[in-house]
Amino acid sequence: MSEYKELSCLAYDLRKKVVEMVVSGKGGHIGGDMSVIDVLVALYFKEMNISPKNMDDPDRDRFVMSKGHSVEAYYAVLAAKGFFPMEEVIEKFSKFGSSYIGHPNNKLPGIEMNSGSLGHGLPVCVGMAL
């Protein structure tokens, strides 16, 4: 199977996981998730130098999800990459007391910063690069 086909199949499967998350959590921004999942899969599984094993490496790539309301897709990709168990995310998404909240939460492995307010990702990334 070609690399493109493998990534397309992964994105398709992760879309299903996003739907499971939204149903389990009784809410979410599913349209935004569906629009960004292909980009996240391509970045995390083809382009970026990032894994649960290299989070302390100063040369790792960093990703900031400024479009924080599409967090379900972000969680699905991070879970598929091995940062945390997929079933845990689906079960606990948007539940009281859970770390898997409706915007990226940097208390979770693989998430560089909290986000939600549109537009603050770019200046934060510039600061990280400096």
Indicate where each model-derived feature is located:
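A broad, low-specificity signal for short, low-complexity segments enriched in glycine/proline
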Residues: 1-2, 26-27, 87
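Cofactor-binding active-site loop characterized by glycine-rich and histidine/acidic residues
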Residues: 6, 18-21, 33-130
